């Protein structure tokens, strides 16, 4: 699916966080539960992820937001004690029950982690490697995709004359943008972001946030953030997670503006106001 595909609402309406019609649910989660060994960390989570929108997941540390994010492209498979139950419906397939090619899935649903994690390779190789891994053999095609991804994250003008240097010499903010470019180079349909600004200084954090805003409407983004102001600035939809009887649960989900201004649940209101959390 092309990232240029038109969304059913205008960019202006997206920026206001209020779609002009009900957007398409690209991914549906129903009754999701996650356990590690005997410990249940997440239970009874149901929500829709809407195409072309940014969905922010908020709530205190330890309430299951990152575990939830990791289920969406099956990264929980890497934890031998993880058990995931429920349904995750994507493109007519239940990702938890049907046979899934996880390599292809992670091309379609990319992940950006909390701390920048560039490979200890050149800038160019950081972006070329995933393309080769996913079967892009033509060098000109790889160059075009790499150039576009670096332009998308605002790095091209900064690094185009030194693509052969180690990615590890870049600043923290540049490294995080490179990691985002590494995901975008595969043209995913959904981009998962686990606190992408939390390890960055305020200036770098602002640059990454501006990048996220530029992605809105072109990509479907799910972002975990503890920065409530950031969630309110960037998101169309928001979900509030909370610990109930030592298990993380989704307390409230809806349009971001509504959740922040007129929350339906007293726990949501208390957390947003700073009275709880």
From Swiss-Prot:
<keyword id="KW-1278">Translocase</keyword>
<dbReference type="Pfam" id="PF00005">
    <property type="entry name" value="ABC_tran"/>
</dbReference>
<keyword id="KW-0472">Membrane</keyword>
<dbReference type="InterPro" id="IPR003439">
    <property type="entry name" value="ABC_transporter-like_ATP-bd"/>
</dbReference>
<dbReference type="GO" id="GO:0005524">
    <property type="term" value="F:ATP binding"/>
</dbReference>
<dbReference type="GO" id="GO:0016887">
    <property type="term" value="F:ATP hydrolysis activity"/>
</dbReference>
<feature type="domain" description="ABC transporter">
    <location>
        <begin position="27"/>
        <end position="272"/>
    </location>
</feature>
<keyword id="KW-0997">Cell inner membrane</keyword>
<dbReference type="GO" id="GO:0015415">
    <property type="term" value="F:ATPase-coupled phosphate ion transmembrane transporter activity"/>
</dbReference>
<dbReference type="InterPro" id="IPR003593">
    <property type="entry name" value="AAA+_ATPase"/>
</dbReference>
<keyword id="KW-0547">Nucleotide-binding</keyword>
<comment type="subunit">
    <text>The complex is composed of two ATP-binding proteins (PstB), two transmembrane proteins (PstC and PstA) and a solute-binding protein (PstS).</text>
</comment>
<protein>
    <recommendedName>
        <fullName>Phosphate import ATP-binding protein PstB 1</fullName>
        <ecNumber>7.3.2.1</ecNumber>
    </recommendedName>
</protein>
<dbReference type="InterPro" id="IPR017871">
    <property type="entry name" value="ABC_transporter-like_CS"/>
</dbReference>
<dbReference type="GO" id="GO:0035435">
    <property type="term" value="P:phosphate ion transmembrane transport"/>
</dbReference>
<dbReference type="GO" id="GO:0005886">
    <property type="term" value="C:plasma membrane"/>
</dbReference>
<keyword id="KW-1003">Cell membrane</keyword>
<keyword id="KW-0067">ATP-binding</keyword>
<keyword id="KW-0813">Transport</keyword>
<keyword id="KW-0592">Phosphate transport</keyword>
<comment type="function">
    <text>Part of the ABC transporter complex PstSACB involved in phosphate import. Responsible for energy coupling to the transport system.</text>
</comment>
<dbReference type="InterPro" id="IPR005670">
    <property type="entry name" value="PstB-like"/>
</dbReference>
<feature type="binding site">
    <location>
        <begin position="59"/>
        <end position="66"/>
    </location>
    <ligand>
        <name>ATP</name>
    </ligand>
</feature>
<comment type="similarity">
    <text>Belongs to the ABC transporter superfamily. Phosphate importer (TC 3.A.1.7) family.</text>
</comment>
<dbReference type="InterPro" id="IPR027417">
    <property type="entry name" value="P-loop_NTPase"/>
</dbReference>
């Amino acid at each position: 699916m092309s990232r240029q595909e038109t969304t059913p609402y205008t960019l202006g309406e997206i920026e206001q966080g209020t779609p002009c019609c009900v957007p398409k649910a690209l991914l549906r989660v129903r009754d999701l539960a996650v356990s590690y060994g005997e410990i249940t960390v997440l239970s009874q989570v149901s929500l829709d992820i809407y195409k072309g929108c940014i969905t922010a997941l908020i709530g205190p540390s330890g309430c299951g937001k990152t575990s939830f994010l990791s289920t969406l492209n099956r990264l929980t498979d890497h934890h031998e004690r993880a058990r995931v139950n429920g349904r995750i419906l994507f493109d007519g397939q239940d990702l938890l029950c049907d046979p899934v090619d996880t390599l292809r899935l992670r091309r379609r649903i990319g992940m950006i982690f909390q701390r920048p994690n560039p490979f200890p390779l050149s800038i160019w190789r950081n972006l070329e490697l995933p393309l080769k891994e996913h079967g892009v053999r033509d060098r000109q095609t790889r160059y075009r995709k790499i150039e576009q991804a670096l332009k998308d994250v605002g790095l091209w003008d900064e690094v185009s004359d030194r693509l052969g240097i180690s990615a590890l010499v870049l600043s923290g903010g540049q490294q995080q943008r490179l990691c985002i470019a590494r995901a975008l180079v595969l043209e995913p349909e959904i981009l998962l972001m686990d606190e992408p600004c939390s390890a960055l200084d305020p200036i770098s954090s602002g640059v990454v946030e501006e990048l996220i805003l530029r992605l809105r409407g072109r990509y479907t983004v799910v972002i975990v953030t503890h920065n409530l102001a950031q969630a309110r600035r960037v998101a169309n939809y928001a979900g509030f997670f909370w610990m109930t009887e030592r298990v993380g649960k989704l307390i409230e989900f809806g349009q971001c503006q509504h959740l922040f201004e007129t929350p339906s649940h007293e726990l949501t209101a208390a957390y947003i106001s700073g009275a709880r959390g």
